[in-house]
Amino acid sequence: MRTSHLLEQLMEALRCLPGVGPKSAQRMAFNLLQRNRQGGLQLADALNRAMTDIGHCRDCRTFTEDDICAVCANPRRQENGQICVVESPADIVAVESTGQFSGRYFVLMGHLSPLDGIGPSDIGLDTLEFRLQKETIAELILATNPTVEGEATAHYIAELCHEYGVPATRIAHGVPVGGELELVDGTTLSHSLAGRQKLNLY
């Protein structure tokens, strides 16, 4: 069956979203056209404005409509002296939800991956190195993902920190709260044993 050219374009555009295949894209397109044309127009307007107006923070590289994001512009965050390095803006949301961090961030927008041609400058490490040189940083917290690439990226940044005399720490990885030991994989358990802490009873 031959469908509308515009409809095919809409379905193809929807497929750029993660996890959306041909069937899902078709279902979304038909739903918008049949039941929610106003919602579709609002979606199109919001997407257009976001793609046009949202850029990157000059200091931390997260998404923002302004030159400097709200976190970097906050004087209390600046006085804290801590910078948490993460791989994506979504990681900032995760860290903020804990309520345990009150410093600033630096977003890599990825990780080192030589096989994919992604080097230090591709993830903003030249910008981070400049900040290590110029700013007084009390602690750089490395919160990259516990993957091979994430660990390699953390190690590379730790070496930069050592070069400029900036204390670097790595977030702990281990057995999840509520998890059962027998179900934990060997690598995670190894990290847990290596990063064990002394119990302070008093």
From Swiss-Prot:
Q: What InterPro entries does this protein map onto? A: DNA_Rcmb_RecR, Rcmb_RecR, Rcmb_RecR_Znf, TOPRIM_dom, TOPRIM_RecR
Keyword annotations: DNA damage, DNA recombination, DNA repair, Metal-binding, Zinc, Zinc-finger
Alphabetical list of SMART domains matching this protein: TOPRIM (SM00493)
What is one process in the GO biological process aspect for this record?
DNA recombination
Which PROSITE patterns does UniProt cross-reference here? RECR, TOPRIM
Chaperone keyword on record: no
Q: Which spans are transmembrane here? A: none
| Keyword field contains Transferase | no
Superkingdom in the source lineage? Bacteria
> Which SUPFAM superfamilies does this UniProt record tie to the protein?
Recombination protein RecR (SSF111304)
Gene3D superfamilies recorded: 3.40.1360.10, 6.10.250.240, RecR Domain 1
Give the Toprim domain ranges: 81-176
Residue spans, zinc finger C4-type: 57-72
GO molecular function terms attached to this record: DNA binding; zinc ion binding
- Homology family: Belongs to the RecR family.
This chain's function reads: May play a role in DNA repair. It seems to be involved in an RecBC-independent recombinational process of DNA repair. It may act with RecF and RecO.
Q: What is this protein called?
A: Recombination protein RecR
Annotated organism of origin: Photobacterium profundum (strain SS9)
The encoding gene: recR
